[in-house]
Amino acid sequence: MGRVRKSDFGSIVLVLCCVLNSLLCNGGITSRYVRKLEATVDMPLDSDVFRVPCGYNAPQQVHITQGDVEGKAVIVSWVTQEAKGSNKVIYWKENSTKKHKAHGKTNTYKFYNYTSGFIHHCPIRNLEYDTKYYYVLGVGQTERKFWFFTPPEIGPDVPYTFGLIGDLGQSYDSNITLTHYENNPTKGQAVLFVGDISYADTYPDHDNRRWDSWGRFAERSTAYQPWIWTTGNHELDFAPEIGENRPFKPFTHRYRTPYRSSGSTEPFWYSIKRGPAYIIVLASYSAYGKYTPQYQWLEEEFPKVNRTETPWLIVLMHSPWYNSYDYHYMEGETMRVMYEAWFVKYKVDVVFAGHVHAYERSERVSNIAYNVVNGICTPVKDQSAPVYITIGDGGNIEGLATKMTEPQPKYSAFREASFGHAIFSIKNRTHAHYGWHRNHDGYAVEGDRMWFYNRFWHPVDDSPSCNS
């Protein structure tokens, strides 16, 4: 055989690159990354991350969320364990000596043989945009001080960054995930949480002490930046065998959402605006069929979105519609059939889901051509459709989903069974950068990434496999 000339070698390389690029754009990527995992078990209740704050009846499990549609209010929530104590929040702007007071409401609940502490929820309204606020809870020796930033004023070219976490739980891997996110120099200004919080329901009798331990574990983040809550199957806590017949009982007592502000009738589906984004939260485990409250609300909600004001349209849900893992395969199908045509019509930019304990990103696809007789039931590329991202890889006790359907479907652009978190950084009305971070990588490493082009302002092809 003769020697290969340099020109021939260059041509071969070019051809191989073109072939590889073609394969990636049509078949997607299944990562073969080898994971180093801690034990997939929950941390014991005496772990440092669950430590109760010092002092009698000190406020604990502090968390905040957005308190209205526009982003000028927050809801501060906390628990006092021994007694009701004060339901007051003192707050003030940075570099200001003028302090304000807000008073909240307190509730308790019982779940089988568990009785909760005193759960406080206090709305703080009429805040200024783009401002740092300090706030204090408790009295005397048990006062605890925290802070948060309000979002910038709503507008199309305001930069804003979201963190993304799902299915977190309270295992050793959960701790790695939250620590990795908290220490990420590019971490979000708010967290979009796609459901499955404490996994208390995996314990006998849904041991609600695990709701308390999770609240203390996550406080290092939830007390300082708003977490936007989505409900998952592990928030249902429906246990008629022990006399607990009310779904979502612990969640609805412990966590608040601004659902009334957006015209919703339940706290499980609602919408908010934050900077340049319009965020719609849907409930995979509440009724969503035609004529249900959630269906009617969403039908009226999409036309309200003003893309000249909030160009980025983001949807959160728990159960993914496009999932190529064996776990929970096709579970989101009935909801997809009900709502997907609206997602395409209104040009949703991205959908974030959890439930599957792994990571996956889709191409822009839709599957709305099917009817009972035409047999057209295969997803197709659709530049008016959203990218679907499954980020249920927070690290919970149930472990990773490692079994995938083979061959990899064409709608799947990238998938990997690893724990991690993601960052969605909106730059302006046309561009946003997305990156997924494995737990065991350095912060500069993005295990997956994509530049998003806004579907309303810049609807050019941003096929993930070809542009990541």
UniProtKB/Swiss-Prot annotation:
<feature type="binding site">
    <location>
        <position position="167"/>
    </location>
    <ligand>
        <name>Fe cation</name>
    </ligand>
</feature>
<comment type="similarity">
    <text>Belongs to the metallophosphoesterase superfamily. Purple acid phosphatase family.</text>
</comment>
<feature type="binding site">
    <location>
        <position position="199"/>
    </location>
    <ligand>
        <name>Fe cation</name>
    </ligand>
</feature>
<dbReference type="GO" id="GO:0005737">
    <property type="term" value="C:cytoplasm"/>
</dbReference>
<keyword id="KW-0964">Secreted</keyword>
<keyword id="KW-0378">Hydrolase</keyword>
<dbReference type="InterPro" id="IPR025733">
    <property type="entry name" value="Purple_acid_PPase_C_dom"/>
</dbReference>
<dbReference type="InterPro" id="IPR029052">
    <property type="entry name" value="Metallo-depent_PP-like"/>
</dbReference>
<feature type="binding site">
    <location>
        <position position="318"/>
    </location>
    <ligand>
        <name>Zn(2+)</name>
    </ligand>
</feature>
<feature type="glycosylation site" description="N-linked (GlcNAc...) asparagine">
    <location>
        <position position="95"/>
    </location>
</feature>
<dbReference type="InterPro" id="IPR004843">
    <property type="entry name" value="Calcineurin-like_PHP_ApaH"/>
</dbReference>
<dbReference type="InterPro" id="IPR008963">
    <property type="entry name" value="Purple_acid_Pase-like_N"/>
</dbReference>
<dbReference type="GO" id="GO:0003993">
    <property type="term" value="F:acid phosphatase activity"/>
</dbReference>
<feature type="glycosylation site" description="N-linked (GlcNAc...) asparagine">
    <location>
        <position position="306"/>
    </location>
</feature>
<dbReference type="InterPro" id="IPR015914">
    <property type="entry name" value="Purple_acid_Pase_N"/>
</dbReference>
<feature type="binding site">
    <location>
        <position position="196"/>
    </location>
    <ligand>
        <name>Zn(2+)</name>
    </ligand>
</feature>
<dbReference type="InterPro" id="IPR041792">
    <property type="entry name" value="MPP_PAP"/>
</dbReference>
<feature type="glycosylation site" description="N-linked (GlcNAc...) asparagine">
    <location>
        <position position="428"/>
    </location>
</feature>
<dbReference type="Pfam" id="PF16656">
    <property type="entry name" value="Pur_ac_phosph_N"/>
</dbReference>
<feature type="binding site">
    <location>
        <begin position="355"/>
        <end position="357"/>
    </location>
    <ligand>
        <name>substrate</name>
    </ligand>
</feature>
<dbReference type="GO" id="GO:0016036">
    <property type="term" value="P:cellular response to phosphate starvation"/>
</dbReference>
<feature type="active site" description="Proton donor">
    <location>
        <position position="328"/>
    </location>
</feature>
<feature type="binding site">
    <location>
        <position position="233"/>
    </location>
    <ligand>
        <name>Zn(2+)</name>
    </ligand>
</feature>
<feature type="binding site">
    <location>
        <position position="233"/>
    </location>
    <ligand>
        <name>substrate</name>
    </ligand>
</feature>
<dbReference type="GO" id="GO:0009505">
    <property type="term" value="C:plant-type cell wall"/>
</dbReference>
<dbReference type="GO" id="GO:0009506">
    <property type="term" value="C:plasmodesma"/>
</dbReference>
<comment type="subunit">
    <text>Homodimer; disulfide-linked.</text>
</comment>
<keyword id="KW-0963">Cytoplasm</keyword>
<feature type="signal peptide">
    <location>
        <begin position="1"/>
        <end position="25"/>
    </location>
</feature>
<feature type="binding site">
    <location>
        <position position="357"/>
    </location>
    <ligand>
        <name>Fe cation</name>
    </ligand>
</feature>
<feature type="glycosylation site" description="N-linked (GlcNAc...) asparagine">
    <location>
        <position position="113"/>
    </location>
</feature>
<protein>
    <recommendedName>
        <fullName>Purple acid phosphatase 10</fullName>
        <ecNumber>3.1.3.2</ecNumber>
    </recommendedName>
</protein>
<keyword id="KW-0732">Signal</keyword>
<keyword id="KW-0862">Zinc</keyword>
<dbReference type="InterPro" id="IPR039331">
    <property type="entry name" value="PPA-like"/>
</dbReference>
<keyword id="KW-0325">Glycoprotein</keyword>
<keyword id="KW-0408">Iron</keyword>
<keyword id="KW-0479">Metal-binding</keyword>
<dbReference type="Pfam" id="PF00149">
    <property type="entry name" value="Metallophos"/>
</dbReference>
<feature type="binding site">
    <location>
        <position position="355"/>
    </location>
    <ligand>
        <name>Zn(2+)</name>
    </ligand>
</feature>
<dbReference type="GO" id="GO:0005576">
    <property type="term" value="C:extracellular region"/>
</dbReference>
<dbReference type="Pfam" id="PF14008">
    <property type="entry name" value="Metallophos_C"/>
</dbReference>
